[in-house]
């Protein structure tokens, strides 16, 4: 427990007087104040929202200077103070606010924990924040409304002297009140599970997985690990092969031990080690999974296209190719699969086509969060236009091995160069899809999208889950075999945005109640990400509230992504996605997957 002298209130002699008054009441506690520029009042070096380079300087106790931008920001709300090498003496580093969890956010959270554990002078930090703020109302038809800012300010005057972060144009911070790891209705956001995993007080590390040797680290201050039950299980593609429990592990607080797990590795395997409570504790039920870690002991098996002796026929005219098999007809036009008739039934509501846009997250919107009327002019909408304007320059068709037909297409797409698509059609109806390109600007996503019948509601996948994950927020999403519905895949934030992605997927089924649908398989060792929902991406992006999402029961949108930009979270309401998690300009993107039609069960 520490004394706090307040928050974001500037600096001055009043804080010295406050400290003296507090010491007179209790002189046994340390003091915290982030706005202390000369560090005469605070017993810790307190920072808000440090970026990766600032974290490294803080950990290495290096001087920190501030820029002109920092000086300007300091006049508004920030406290980005300079730090000299001498100031580190006897003062640990504490992040009084970090990991800004503004709706679909909290990216690279695990990277912060890695820094906390790497540097001895790091105390940790406080996530901003715990719960969204919104007002609940019921519409006349009973629909739940979660309202914010401008929903209540139609009569309020707009003042010319309002600060930018109170938005003179709108009179409020609008949805900037949605920063929690749980929702205003106390439903859990996906980032909650990321926090739960990253903050887990027990960690298992591989020593020699081939022989079953692992190190268990106890990060708890007062509890021996023998109070928990250690469980392990081995799976192949989500199918359980072996499982067991260890005898209680004697590992005192802040220590580590080596354990041996009694498994064999004759097949492609993945291992999960977990620790669970053995009795009910305050706030925790007996059997609650306290901590877990996963290890890929062997790579996933690769899909093998079944050889089929059937014949394919095709007709090629310009940028249009029609392919006929025994029970299907597939048409490619202008780089898109525009028709796919299987067993006499059209499977596509809208084409299988390249996709580069996502419904903008709060962090994607960046500084325009402070000026909402200008969001529609955001440069990232250029990717939406690029997606609409992509077209084929040249289409080449050739007969491939095993009676296949290969279609190679050179595409022209704004913001991309060297844009190439290959479709390979097998006699049994399977479709191999390959796409490569080099972005001229950082991308939101590099993938394909197809619109299927709304009856395609049932989902089964092997990948990370069960909740949504992104390339910079997937530590807390375990690899496994999951099943759900398209409706349940959706996660709702207060302001609708990209939200339902599942990363590191190797195998996906999307079917109706009769088993008709599609299977998607990763090709070689590169998994894909997917999302599915009963509305369009553009409709999601236009909605300002949950109740405004234009649900359409007649369609299911399926996204199959080779890459998607992370969600970020280093800075409040700003992109700041770290370099490893971007889809970076100038770096070639490529991926492949296999689409297989699933027929109705007989």
Language model: regions and residue ranges:
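Beta-sheet entry/capping signal
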Residues: 2, 29-32, 44, 92-93, ...
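Substrate-binding/catalytic cleft of secreted carbohydrate-active enzymes
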Residues: 1-173, 177
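Carbohydrate-binding surfaces of carbohydrate-active enzymes
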Residues: 115-337, 433
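A broad, structural surface signal
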Residues: 16, 20, 110-117, 193, ...
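Short beta-turn/strand-loop junction motif enriched in small, turn-promoting residues
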Residues: 100, 112-113, 219-221, 412, ...
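Flexible loop/turn segments at secondary-structure boundaries
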Residues: 9-13, 39-41, 53-54, 101-103, ...
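Active-site-proximal structural scaffolding
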Residues: 11, 15, 38, 89, ...
